[in-house]
């Protein structure tokens, strides 16, 4: 990989010291102050024995302190992982991980110690991100400094960067989509407004009252904003990823004056692989766009393959390509149209749902003889989790939903239960899910 500067926070603090870097919960931090605070966090980590190449996890809710901790750990040379909103319990972390919590950040804010610059080699790992679990349990992905830098540059060349940009981040920071917003904004020298999560009223107010120019959303969040009458036309870009979005929803957003650009990406490729350009939003409804500059995408036997400097080195197969497991096609102009997944994963509201988990929980109910779970296209959720049940006697579907809630995460609970007399199967007995929806 080519040498490339990775001391982007130092660069932005030097060239745009008074520009707001972080905003959230009534607090704003400019780049000069962020560099000071990040240096103090790096010094605090050194006191804890963490430095270059060591694993550090941030156990803080999404917000300005989380971003300060992230940049401090990067400045220390650590390999950083963000914890999910629910905290560290049960989360896969590297051996010997040092945790940064609220107390660490408060101590760092008070000590304000200087810390030297650090430029990481582009081939060295920068972040440890758990994949979304497309083909099973989430797996750790090590993304290099070069992966993040090239992803930011490719996105900038495609979407553009304006000096007064303020990117609204309401996505979880333990996922690469949220994490990338914090890093890109530091690389660009632009602001990021961080919300502790997605709240439709709060985002609606932010779009109305704050200078938000870019928003990253999953499809269900876009639907909720449309239903709330939010000013979706105010930002210069709405970036939509994380799952399928219906053409009706896209047309509605475009009809309200929004510039909606779909994107296709994944953890192993450091978010965006293909993304529509702002000028293509209306003409290419339903497409995920062309590959970003520096990235290649092709389709082999229906499967989307990716290679380029944004791909995690360990994710590459022997042929030099990342085999995504996603299905799609490239049109004659090179635009990608995502057509589903090679496996049966359901993406509902931006969350991955494994049908086998849901089926196992439902089969624990004594009145369920057989069950198959599939995703049905849905305006709000992208795909609604739907259970098709062969009953063993009398079955109250509402009672079955209650049963599911006691055993599954909220996003895994079926939105609908349909009673059927039999499940469609192959000659070998496998359920044909595609015939259910």
What are these model-derived regions, one by one?
Residues 1-6, 10, 18-49, 57, ...:
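Conserved AMP-binding/adenylate-forming core of the ANL superfamily
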Residues 2-5, 17-18, 113-130, 137, ...:
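Conserved pre-ATP/AMP-binding loop-to-beta segment of ANL
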Residues 27-29, 43-87, 172, 352:
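Conserved AMP-binding/adenylate-forming
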Residues 30-32, 126-153:
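Conserved AMP-binding A3 loop
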Residues 149-166, 174-214:
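Conserved AMP-binding/adenylation subdomain of ANL enzymes
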Residues 212-217, 225-283, 296:
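Gly/Ser/Thr-rich phosphate-binding loop
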Residues 274, 287-294, 298-323, 329, ...:
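Conserved ATP/PPi-binding loop(s) of AMP-dependent carboxylate-activating enzymes
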Residues 308, 327-412, 422, 431, ...:
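AMP-binding/adenylate-forming catalytic core of the ANL superfamily
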